[in-house]
Amino acid sequence: MAELQEVQITEEKPLLPGQTPEAAKEAELAARILLDQGQTHSVETPYGSVTFTVYGTPKPKRPAILTYHDVGLNYKSCFQPLFQFEDMQEIIQNFVRVHVDAPGMEEGAPVFPLGYQYPSLDQLADMIPCVLQYLNFSTIIGVGVGAGAYILARYALNHPDTVEGLVLINIDPNAKGWMDWAAHKLTGLTSSIPEMILGHLFSQEELSGNSELIQKYRNIITHAPNLDNIELYWNSYNNRRDLNFERGGDITLKCPVMLVVGDQAPHEDAVVECNSKLDPTQTSFLKMADSGGQPQLTQPGKLTEAFKYFLQGMGYMASSCMTRLSRSRTASLTSAASVDGNRSRSRTLSQSSESGTLSSGPPGHTMEVSC
């Protein structure tokens, strides 16, 4: 009989002295985020150069997650709190991400010369095919905020075969009317560009409260070295055309859509109206309580949870585990309609602040989340 030999097994990822498993997990997450700095590229388009940053590697038979930020922000200030959130890591490990910066909004961007003709929002949408062609990506799941949500919606109308799903936060699909235009001009006489943009991003209650978050973003926008560029993007947003969505008509989004807005947010009415114009069997409406004007900044955990369910409804991440938010609330989720061959689905959720449970509701209703 062969002599038995003693084998010493070493822990693959030993803990540091005094380090708890939770602290080790947080350190590992921080290290992974620090190491993945992304690769930044620029590509020429018919309307000028556009810069974008790619994180991760393409996954076979999976779309890329492509983001587009709002006015006054770039991809980092708009999306970093969301995509660096711990529970989001399970999602981003399964998808390559492309974060697009509007022209002149990227870090270190030079100020455009006087008289520069900034692209319209429609033209910004027409830049996206150049990005996808450069990367050789065929389909995307778009995540946009404010002006970025409009741009992705316009792109989806023009290129429906390349968009598998959309998460549209604070979208206003309507052109400014005469009353809106007059109010904007009047506000411009008494308010600075940074203050007008802050009023676009955050609710009046948030601005009056002057929280640490508001102070941070007021400082970012007020002292932005490319403030002249930001004003050009702002002007393009205010001169947007109507998307002309029509429920049951030819002009509509043909992919699954999740509309998101904060309760009492500046764009709440616009998002509610947008929801009324889209196909209810393809659209989920998430109204988030206590999230203010930028839910991806203030409530990344809740938005991550909703995004995960959205992806599961499209047929991705079916075996995904529940996040801490759901586990802690022993939540249950049921789909209002099963996924068909085209991954079409309609799902509505409501979350009660009293019971703290998720439940399904009839199609077309609001998904309200409050904790």
UniProtKB/Swiss-Prot annotation:
Phosphoserine: modified positions: 326, 328, 332, 335, 338, 344, 350, 352-353, 355, 370
Subunit structure: Interacts with CTNNB1.
Ranges annotated as biased composition (Low complexity): 347-361
SUPFAM superfamilies (UniProt xref): alpha/beta-Hydrolases (SSF53474)
Native organism: Pongo abelii
Name assigned to this protein: Protein NDRG2
Major localization class: cytoplasm
Keyword Cytoplasm among record annotations: yes
Pfam families per record: Ndr
Function: Contributes to the regulation of the Wnt signaling pathway. Down-regulates CTNNB1-mediated transcriptional activation of target genes, such as CCND1, and may thereby act as tumor suppressor. May be involved in dendritic cell and neuron differentiation.
